[in-house]
Structure formats: structure tokens, C-alpha cells
């Protein structure tokens, strides 16, 4: 039997963005490359990679009426393609995981290309674009006021470099990506009716302060009120808040942190706005300028995509995101002061009451839990609301005893997407899958909800699996909040 010497997981090889309509003149092929990571690669290599991608896209276009080439698998790499806007292509290149074994005294590499799920990593590629659009707008709109096409391209390249240099450093390790990353899903915090209504009342801020067009509330990393944002925009807001606000102290990045944010995180006593940071020329230190314009984001409200100012307010464990029309004058300090005086007492009281309620629930649940709940063989479940992209699961995503990659890939293949075609497919179905490593996956779909139960039992029969899955469905599907949308 061959001895396993080493296993190399999935890694990011390169990520680049190009547009074939640029650089049409011979000798200007480099203009097609708008962004390339890693940046220290020779220009000729970048041009060759983009040229190869162009050839692949054109070749596959001869076999389908769609202009969307999706993936190319080779022995050592997997390339994922995504065209978010006409002419603009994002390409993600991954190194295939491999196992190095010793056979008859010779090291042999066994590449495991089947472990890479196209659906998971194409979803991550789409999210890379959606986060850019959320913070900067569409590719085609960047520099639209500039009449010179070369200068317009340069402005776009600068924005891409500024955004993706930071975004890729915060990107989740490809080896750890799973079905949750594919779904772009978020978790809502279920509350009792009284607390939920108190949180919902902050939606009336639009009446008290007409400048506010929408508000989103989170408690730690879970959403309390999602407002009228689309699931995709809500996921972008959630990702931005989690990465750039909630985890800012643990991060070594240069994200702006106001004194009020540091105070609200560390002491959890006084609320405050998270303000932007302005770099002062010739000064090594960055300063928070209280007159800085708030961050501008691009979301869809009332079926219209347009820019909004995003104000982020922190009080204890609550984060409140306020959206103001960016077509108007940027908010002045007086508005910040009025909002702070109005919201601080109410949000602080609400945050403390939620914390108290969660503490009581945790104490009650502690007596019912057992240590086997997180074991590798314990039943796992995942429930998905396709329309709101809510999910509920007991997956331990960051622990070593998580689900094997082949199981996650099967779930990704079984999962229905949120697109119109997928949502109009079979309204109800049930599928059971047995894997080679003794896992059973049971999927049920009904009324735009997907339910998965994952069992690990080598001796289980089909009847045993059916009965256990039914028991878990009946036991866990008791939260009406999850199914109300």
C-alpha cells in the first residue's frame, strides 16, 4: 500500500479581470488586463493567461447559445469564469488539491480534482463582483464622467486595484469554503414577539428622520431586521459589517476605526457612529475627520439601483445600518448628534434585553445538550429558505470534525439556486444519497424551502435513514420565524 507523505489543500493560484474590447490594436494587448492577482507576475504571463481565457470562452461559445463559459478543469488547476457585465470577465484559478504518496520508493502526486465544486467557487466569484458593485458601482459606470476612454480605463484599474488588493486578503481560505459560502446565506436571530417588535420599530426611523430611506439591524453577526433590501444586497451589507466593523480589532488590516467604535466594542457601554478615516498627506498616521463624507454604497431600493450614504451605528452588540439618499447633500454633524440622542438609549436598552434573553436560553439549552452533539457521527442538518436566503444549521464550520469535503460537494450539487429557473423547477422532491465513506444525505424540498439531514452510520438501512431524517425534521422545524418569508 502506498504511504501518504503529504496532502496539499486547495489554494488560490490567480484571480484576474479583463475586457477584450480594450487593447484591440496590436501591441496594446496589455490594456485588456484590468486587474491581476498576484501583482508581481510578469506582464507577458498576464497577457498569455488572459489570451488563453479568451480562447476558451470563444471555443465553448461554439457549442452553446449562452455566452457564459463557467469552468475548465485540468489535471493541476481549475478555472472558474464569470461575466457580470457585457465584456467584463472575472477568472478565478485554483490549484487542485493533491496527495503525495510513496510508491516503490518514488513520490507520486495524486491530484484530487473532483474535490473542487464548481458551484461553490463560482458563487464565491460572483460574490467578489457583488462586493465591488456594493462599494463602487458597476464596472461600466466607473469613470463614466471621463470622455477619454484610456483615462476611463485607468480610473477603473485604480478602483479595482484598491478594492481587490484588500478584498482578496480577507477572502475565506478556498480549502474551507462550503455550501454556506455558495448560498450567500445569512442567519437571522430568532426573538420572542416583544423583542422582535421593538427591533422592528426602528424601521419607523424613516418617519422620524425623512433623510433615512432604509435601516438594517444586526445583533453580533446575526440579522434582526433586514428591511426591504434584496437578499443579495443584504448579504453584502452583512459581509461588510462583519468583516470591517465587528472583526476590526482582531484584524491587522488598515480599516478605519473611530474612537466611538473602539469604545463600543471594548467597553460595550456607549454607542457611537463608525466614521470614515482620511489619510493626511505626509503624515504616517491616519486620522478620523468628523466632517468626512460617509461611505457611499450601491443597493436596490424600490426597484431602483442607486447610491446611498451608509451610516453605521454601534451600541453594545447591536449594529444599526442607516441608508441615506446620496443624491442629496452629505449629512452634517447635527444629524449625527440628533440620531445619537434619539437612538442611544433605546438601542442600549434593547441590546441588554436581548443579551439577557439569550443568556437565559443558553442556560436552559446547556442542560439538554450533550458532548456528542458536535461529534463527527452526530446528525447534522441544514435548512434553507430560497427566497430570503435564511439558513439554520448545526454545522461546525470551523472545527476539524466538520463534514468531509465530498459530502459538502454533494450537498452543493443537490442544492437549488436562487435563480428564476431553479425556483420554477420541481416544487417538491425528496432525494437520498449514500456516499462511499458511509454518509447518508437526505434532501427534501417544498414551498421554496430546502431541508438536508446528514447522517453517518455504516450499518443504517434505507428505512433507518428515512425514520431518523423524519425525526430530525419534526424536532428542528419548530421555529416559525425561519419560515415566515
UniProtKB/Swiss-Prot annotation:
GO CC terms of this entry: cytosol; intracellular membrane-bounded organelle; Mon1-Ccz1 complex
- What's a BP term from Gene Ontology annotated to this protein? autophagy
Tell me which InterPro entries the record gives: Ccz1, CCZ1/INTU/HSP4_longin_1, CCZ1/INTU/HSP4_longin_3, CCZ1/INTU_longin_2
Report which superkingdom the organism of origin falls in. Eukaryota
Question: Where does it primarily localize?
Answer: cytoplasm
Q: What happens when the gene is disrupted?
A: Accumulation of autophagosomes and reduced number of autolysosomes in fat cells caused by disruption of Rab7 recruitment to autophagosomes leading to a defect in autophagosome-autolysosome fusion. Impaired lysosomal degradation of endocytosed Notch and Boss receptors in the developing eye leading to their accumulation in the brain.
Which key words are in the record? Cytoplasm, Guanine-nucleotide releasing factor, Transport
Official protein name in the record: Vacuolar fusion protein CCZ1 homolog
Which gene name belongs to this protein?
Ccz1
Amino acid at each position: 500500500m502506498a504511504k501518504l507523505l503529504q496532502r496539499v489543500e486547495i489554494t488560490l493560484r490567480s484571480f484576474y479581470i479583463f475586457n477584450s474590447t480594450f487593447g484591440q490594436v496590436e501591441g496594446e494587448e496589455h490594456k485588456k488586463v484590468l486587474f491581476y492577482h498576484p501583482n508581481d507576475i510578469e506582464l507577458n504571463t498576464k497577457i498569455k493567461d488572459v489570451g488563453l481565457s479568451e480562447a476558451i470562452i470563444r471555443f465553448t461559445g461554439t457549442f452553446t447559445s449562452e455566452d457564459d463559459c463557467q469552468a475548465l478543469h485540468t489535471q493541476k488547476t481549475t478555472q472558474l469564469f464569470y461575466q457580470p457585465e457585457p465584456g467584463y470577465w472575472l477568472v478565478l484559478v485554483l490549484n487542485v488539491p493533491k496527495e503525495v504518496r510513496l510508491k516503490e520508493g518514488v513520490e507520486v502526486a495524486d491530484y484530487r480534482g473532483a474535490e473542487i465544486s464548481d458551484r461553490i467557487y463560482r458563487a464565491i466569484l460572483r460574490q467578489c463582483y457583488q462586493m465591488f458593485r456594493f462599494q463602487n458601482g458597476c464596472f461600466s459606470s466607473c469613470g463614466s464622467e471621463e470622455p477619454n476612454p484610456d483615462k476611463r480605463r485607468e480610473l477603473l484599474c485604480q478602483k479595482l486595484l484598491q478594492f481587490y488588493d484588500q478584498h482578496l486578503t480577507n477572502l475565506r481560505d478556498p480549502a474551507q469554503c462550503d455550501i454556506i459560502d455558495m448560498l450567500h446565506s445569512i442567519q437571522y436571530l430568532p426573538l420572542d414577539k416583544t423583542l422582535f417588535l421593538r427591533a422592528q420599530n426602528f424601521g419607523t426611523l424613516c418617519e422620524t428622520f425623512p433623510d433615512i430611506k432604509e435601516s438594517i439591524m444586526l445583533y453580533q453577526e446575526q440579522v434582526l431586521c433586514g428591511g426591504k433590501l434584496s437578499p443579495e444586497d443584504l448579504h453584502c451589507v452583512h459581509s461588510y459589517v462583519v468583516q470591517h466593523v465587528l472583526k476590526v480589532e482582531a484584524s491587522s488590516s488598515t480599516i478605519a476605526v473611530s474612537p466611538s467604535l473602539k469604545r463600543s466594542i471594548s467597553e460595550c457601554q456607549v454607542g457611537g457612529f463608525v466614521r470614515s478615516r482620511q489619510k493626511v498627506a505626509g503624515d504616517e498616521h491616519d486620522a478620523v475627520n468628523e466632517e468626512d463624507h460617509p461611505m457611499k454604497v450601491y443597493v436596490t431600493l424600490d426597484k431602483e439601483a442607486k447610491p446611498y450614504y451608509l451610516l453605521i451605528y454601534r451600541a453594545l452588540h447591536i449594529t444599526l445600518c442607516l441608508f441615506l439618499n446620496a443624491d442629496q447633500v452629505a449629512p452634517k454633524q447635527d444629524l449625527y448628534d440628533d440620531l445619537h440622542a434619539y437612538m442611544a438609549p433605546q438601542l442600549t436598552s434593547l441590546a441588554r434585553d436581548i443579551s439577557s434573553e439569550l443568556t437565559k436560553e443558553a442556560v436552559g439549552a446547556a442542560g439538554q445538550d450533550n458532548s456528542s452533539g458536535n461529534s463527527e457521527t452526530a446528525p447534522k442538518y441544514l435548512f434553507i429558505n430560497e427566497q430570503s436566503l435564511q439558513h439554520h444549521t448545526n454545522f461546525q464550520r470551523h472545527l476539524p470534525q466538520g463534514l468531509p469535503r465530498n459530502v459538502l460537494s454533494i450537498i452543493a450539487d443537490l442544492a437549488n439556486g436562487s435563480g428564476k429557473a431553479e425556483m420554477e423547477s420541481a416544487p417538491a422532491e425528496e432525494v437520498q444519497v449514500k456516499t462511499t465513506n458511509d454518509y447518508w444525505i437526505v434532501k427534501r424540498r417544498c414551498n421554496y424551502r430546502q431541508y438536508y439531514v446528514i447522517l453517518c452510520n455504516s450499518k443504517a438501512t434505507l428505512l433507518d435513514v428515512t425514520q431518523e431524517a423524519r425525526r430530525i425534521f419534526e424536532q428542528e422545524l419548530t421555529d416559525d420565524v425561519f419560515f415566515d418569508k
